Design a protein with these regions (language model features):
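Compact, glycine-rich, soluble single-domain proteins
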Residues: 30-39, 44
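Phosphoinositide-dependent membrane-docking surfaces
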Residues: 15-23
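Short, structured protein-protein interaction patches enriched in aromatics and acidic/basic residues
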Residues: 44-58
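Short, charged/polar surface micro-motifs in flexible loops or helix N-caps
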Residues: 12, 24-29, 38, 59-61, ...
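Amphipathic alpha-helical interaction segments
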Residues: 25, 39-43, 79
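Short aromatic-glycine motifs in intrinsically disordered, low-complexity regions
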Residues: 1-12
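C-terminal structural segments of small proteins and small subunits
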Residues: 54-90
C-alpha cells in the first residue's frame, strides 16, 4: 500500500519512493543539488523558503523541502507505525 507524507506547504511525496532525507548544508549535497538543477531532476517544494532538507527518490529525483530532515524522518516513521498497526487489526 502506497503511503504519502506531507513535506510542507501542501506538498506530498510517496513514502515508498524515498531513499534518503539529507541536510543540504554538506558540500557533497550542495554539489548534488546543483548538478541536479542542471540535469532538471530537482523538484523544488520549498515555496520560496530556505531549503532545509533534500529527499532523494528511487528514480533519482531530488525533492527540496523547507522542513527539517528530522521532521520528515519523524513523519516517515509515524506513517510506518500507523500502517503496521493497521495491518495487525485486519
Amino acid at each position: 500500500m502506497a503511503g504519502f507524507i506531507i513535506i510542507g506547504f501542501g506538498n506530498i511525496v510517496n513514502r515508498d519512493k524515498i531513499v534518503a532525507v539529507v541536510s543540504p548544508d554538506a558540500a557533497p549535497v550542495k554539489r548534488m543539488v546543483q548538478q541536479g538543477k542542471e540535469e532538471k531532476i530537482v523538484i523544488d517544494a520549498t515555496q520560496g523558503r530556505r531549503t532545509k532538507a533534500v529527499l532523494v527518490t528511487q528514480e533519482g529525483f531530488l525533492v527540496l523541502s523547507a522542513l527539517q530532515p528530522d521532521t520528515i524522518g519523524k513523519r516517515l516513521h509515524a506513517e510506518k507505525i500507523i500502517e503496521e498497526k493497521g495491518d495487525l487489526d485486519e
